């Protein structure tokens, strides 16, 4: 699959003024169908440079993530709802995410632990609003810039794999530390609001009884 994506990047590189649009469309589709976005992100650095590459990756990733979110919400939600019917814990967590969705989306976008493509569909079956979900995509910016920058160091698509060895170690460690902090933060935060939501759900059910 990596070879196909590299060939696609080579083709895009020769499109001239249409290259940006073709790249963003490819990235959008890749996000929806679970293709490895890392290759495209690194390749953007070679084809477009750091600034434009980062912009095009962000737009393509956001469009793809939004499309996957909508598919998860309107096409897969019914099936998932049947699977978790009667599960009070999921309902409580779902409601909690709906209340604090923006913060959670931003933190999970900053963290490298959460799989990007799968997470897009997972958010679709929660109560997080589309607005908060899209705004939360801003959390992708630091990682996007880093990987596009690393890709730009390769100089050509043929040597793309060697770019990671040339990257500034300080930059790499900075992004890793930010990602680690975000991972810890989102874990603690989700646990906290989930526990609060569960307690509220339990109290409500007791009052109803």
UniProtKB/Swiss-Prot annotation:
Xref: Pfam families: VTT_dom
Similarity comment text for this entry: Belongs to the TVP38/TMEM64 family.
Entry keyword annotation includes Membrane: yes
GO annotations of cellular component type: plasma membrane
Cell compartments where the protein resides: Cell membrane
Membrane-spanning ranges: 15-35, 39-59, 110-130, 134-154, 171-191
Keywords: Cell membrane, Membrane, Transmembrane, Transmembrane helix
Lineage: Bacteria, Bacillati, Cyanobacteriota, Cyanophyceae, Synechococcales
Domain of life of the native organism: Bacteria
Principal place of residence: membrane
InterPro entries on file: TMEM64, VTT_dom
Name of the molecule in the record: TVP38/TMEM64 family membrane protein slr0305
Membrane topology: Multi-pass membrane protein
